[in-house]
């Protein structure tokens, strides 16, 4: 838009007469209509948001999570927050939908991921997928760098098998290359939302075409 205008999150659901289950708001289109993304869709499942510092990727993560919390009860939706820097997702730490307190250390994060895997396996056995669990990870590369192979393996397992059990990853990263993420984990993010990056090559890496 020639002139940027603020968009109030609370106003977006009011513009819709019927919001599909587990549909999150991304913002508005050029003509002012709400943009939605439905997590259970086969071509969605997990979302990777890429962009340089200050590009708004963490703000978009917060919008997605807050919009889901606004339109779903705790019996329908649970949220896991992993934030190594304890800044980006901290404003959501008071949500009643949280499965556990916000995790910031590698040990806390791995314990939460393993708890989610246990739940995923239980659901596979029972054949259920609700309540949906959104696992939000800010600064994904920092988490993998500090948590090592155990954290990467846990994330990859959830990315590969989580959708049918109702588990969805929502992650933010500055430059999500295969070398940094691991090729298997990166391949299991069907949706890539790319903000401002430092170069054309960074954009290609973030979008998964390089």
Provide a role label for each language-model segment.
Residues 12-208:
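P-loop NTPase catalytic phosphate-binding loop
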């Amino acid at each position: 838009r020639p002139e940027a205008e603020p968009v109030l999150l609370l106003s977006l659901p009011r513009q819709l007469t019927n919001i599909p289950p587990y549909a999150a708001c991304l913002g508005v289109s050029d003509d002012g209509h709400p943009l939605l993304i439905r997590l259970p869709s086969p071509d969605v499942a997990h979302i990777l948001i890429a962009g340089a510092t200050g590009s708004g990727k963490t703000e978009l993560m917060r919008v997605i999570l807050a919009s889901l919390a606004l339109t779903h009860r705790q019996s329908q939706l649970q949220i896991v927050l992993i934030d190594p820097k304890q800044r980006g997702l901290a404003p959501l730490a008071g949500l009643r939908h949280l499965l556990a307190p916000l995790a910031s250390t590698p040990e806390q994060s791995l314990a939460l991921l393993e708890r989610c895997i246990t739940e995923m396996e239980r659901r596979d056995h029972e054949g259920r997928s609700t309540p949906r669990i959104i696992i939000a990870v800010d600064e994904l590369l920092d988490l993998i760098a500090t948590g090592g192979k155990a954290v990467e393996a846990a994330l990859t397992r959830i990315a590969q098998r989580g959708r049918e059990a109702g588990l969805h990853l929502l992650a933010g990263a500055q430059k999500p290359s295969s070398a940094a993420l691991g090729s298997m984990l990166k391949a299991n993010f069907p949706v890539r939302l790319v903000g401002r990056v430092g170069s054309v090559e960074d954009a290609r890496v973030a979008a998964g075409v390089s």
